[in-house]
């Protein structure tokens, strides 16, 4: 009887420890996710040196990415046709 009570108590303690560890990992997950998102956004800003589609541009300058041209009418970067 004492052995079964000891095993039941040890099982409850083990369950508590596992649940506590899982909960602490869940609390840190949003922070890690946000830091990863902001790190990727910073990297994207440094990587791109040309204007994407529908971005404001100046006609005559070569600001748009390849396969795109600055429209003189709308002053937006658009696909070359």
Curated annotation (Swiss-Prot):
Keyword Transmembrane helix tagged: no
Compartments (UniProt record): Secreted
GO molecular function terms attached to this record: ion channel inhibitor activity; toxin activity
Tissue expression remark: Expressed by the venom gland.
Intrachain S-S bonds: 50-65, 57-70
Pfam families in alphabetical order: Toxin_12 (PF07740)
Keywords: Disulfide bond, Knottin, Neurotoxin, Postsynaptic neurotoxin, Secreted, Signal, Toxin
Signal peptide: 1-21
UniProt entry tagged with the keyword Glycoprotein: no
Propeptide stretch(es), residue numbers: 22-48
Role played: Binds to the nicotinic acetylcholine receptor. Blocks neuromuscular transmission.
Name of the protein in question: U6-theraphotoxin-Hs1a
Source organism of this protein record: Cyriopagopus schmidti
């Amino acid at each position: 009887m004492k052995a079964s009570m000891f095993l039941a108590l040890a099982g409850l303690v083990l369950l508590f420890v596992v649940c506590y560890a899982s909960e602490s990992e869940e609390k840190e997950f949003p922070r890690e996710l946000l830091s990863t998102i902001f790190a990727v956004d910073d990297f994207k800003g440094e990587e791109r040196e040309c204007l994407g589609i529908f971005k404001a541009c100046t006609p005559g300058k070569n600001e748009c990415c390849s396969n795109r041209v600055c429209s003189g009418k709308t002053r937006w970067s658009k696909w070359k046709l």
